[in-house]
Amino acid sequence: MSDTSETICSMCQLFYVNKWVLGTGGGIGIKQDNIAYISPSGIEKELLEPEQIVKYNIQDDTYQCGAPGLKPSACTPLFLELFKTLGASCVIHTHSINAVLCSMIYEKEFTIKDIEQIKAIPKGDGTNLRNVDTLRIPIIDNAPEEQDLMPALKQMIKDYPNACAVLVKRHGLFVWGPTPKKAKIYIESIDYLFEVALKMKELGQ
């Protein structure tokens, strides 16, 4: 049992309490050297145990499951692409209500500015955005299977090389960062900003 596996379980339990990963939805992947630790498919996140975490060997595309019948999250190809292309060490995928609603209300980008919490989001040059900057999160169309999102994800990476998140329309949110701690900070801040934006629209702001 590794600290990384325990980290994934702890985050899954927290995100379940937040109602971001209900009904087996969502997933988390953490990369350490050539091994990606990935939450398994079909397991309720609040019940996930460290020994159930899938260990995926990035070099030879093989994986080991801690229990019979388990397989990696359907998000695995997307996680691996973000690890490889952007150098991320942690990717979090959630199905939060705020994320789904924002993906439906906004067209190609979610944007927000002049909110203090924006300061928690990286700018892409080693610094963070300022509260007066505009946060832009791209939105891509959903697909029948997670792996079918790959072409849109690759195009998003080209169009938004400094992004740390992408919304999938009527589906959810992917967030990534250089460490699990950073990725957790980003996704908590972004979901908070989604909620602020939704309430602002309710108030006609």
UniProtKB/Swiss-Prot annotation:
Q: In which pathway does it act?
A: Amino-acid biosynthesis; L-methionine biosynthesis via salvage pathway; L-methionine from S-methyl-5-thio-alpha-D-ribose 1-phosphate: step 2/6
How does the cofactor bind to this protein, according to its record? Binds 1 zinc ion per subunit.
Q: Which InterPro entries match?
A: Aldolase_II/adducin_N, Aldolase_II/adducin_N_sf, MethylthioRu-1-P_deHdtase_MtnB, Salvage_MtnB_euk
Q: Does the keyword Repeat apply?
A: no
| Residues holding Zn(2+) | H93, H95, H171
Q: Which coarse location class describes where this protein primarily resides?
A: cytoplasm
Statement: the UniProt record of this protein carries the keyword Membrane: no
Q: Which reaction does it catalyse?
A: 5-(methylsulfanyl)-D-ribulose 1-phosphate = 5-methylsulfanyl-2,3-dioxopentyl phosphate + H2O
Assigned keywords, A-Z: Amino-acid biosynthesis, Cytoplasm, Lyase, Metal-binding, Methionine biosynthesis, Zinc
GO BP annotations of the record are:
L-methionine salvage from methylthioadenosine
**Molecular function, one GO term:** methylthioribulose 1-phosphate dehydratase activity
List the catalytic residues: E116
Provide the cofactor list for this protein.
Answer: Zn(2+)
Q: Quick one: which residues bind substrate? A: C75
Q: Which GO terms describe its cellular component?
A: cytoplasm
Enzyme Commission no: 4.2.1.109
Q: Where in the cell is it found?
A: Cytoplasm
Q: Which family does it belong to?
A: Belongs to the aldolase class II family. MtnB subfamily.
Cited NCBIfam families: salvage_mtnB
**Which PANTHER family does the record match to this protein?**
METHYLTHIORIBULOSE-1-PHOSPHATE DEHYDRATASE
Q: What's its job? A: Catalyzes the dehydration of methylthioribulose-1-phosphate (MTRu-1-P) into 2,3-diketo-5-methylthiopentyl-1-phosphate (DK-MTP-1-P).
The name this protein carries in UniProt is: Methylthioribulose-1-phosphate dehydratase
Q: What is the protein's species of origin?
A: Kluyveromyces lactis (strain ATCC 8585 / CBS 2359 / DSM 70799 / NBRC 1267 / NRRL Y-1140 / WM37)
